[in-house]
Amino acid sequence: MANHEIHQCRGCFSCWFKKPGECVLQDNMQKLLQLYNESDIIGFATPIYTWNMTALLKNFVDRLAPLKCPKMTEQNGNYDLQDVKAKTQKFVVISNCGFPGDNNFEVLRASVAYCNPSLEIYRNCGKLLKTKNPIACEKVEQWLKVVERAGREMLVQGNISADIAEALNMQLMSVKEYAAFLGM
């Protein structure tokens, strides 16, 4: 998305009331919405710097407004706007964070829950993904192989097996070791 011109949503809701499904902003989003609608799998990938998805991804998500219509729906006490067309895509969310602990992904998890992701990959201790440390590299390589298997299973089966889901959450390093690795 960084290479696409995507203006910020103005909140004018012309895409709902004046010209349903059409945004007044003229940028690359029209083509991206077309690709989004034609895709079998939608992937949202973002690092966590502070609490949630980056502004780049949030801007894209905000610009999905033309895919909604101004009719409220309720499901299990949660309210949202009705989709113009039923979602048939599977959603995949991938994120990493430099801090240890899974709590760093709570806001993102809540933000994407509405799209009911088929696969969520959250990697804490993200600084290890670029390390040259031989001890950490071995564990990172092992984890990356699991990520590849998860992707393959997602493409072929439409979901991932329980053993892959569990392996995606493998600890790369203890919090104490990671703090020492960071020099903290």
Residue ranges: model-predicted function:
Residues 56, 70-119:
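Short, glycine-/small-residue-rich phosphate/pyrophosphate-handling segment
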Residues 1-69, 137-184:
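N-terminal beta1-alpha1-beta2 submodule of the flavodoxin-like/Rossmannoid cofactor-binding fold
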Residues 119-127:
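Beta-strand-loop-alpha "switch" segments that mediate conformational coupling across diverse proteins
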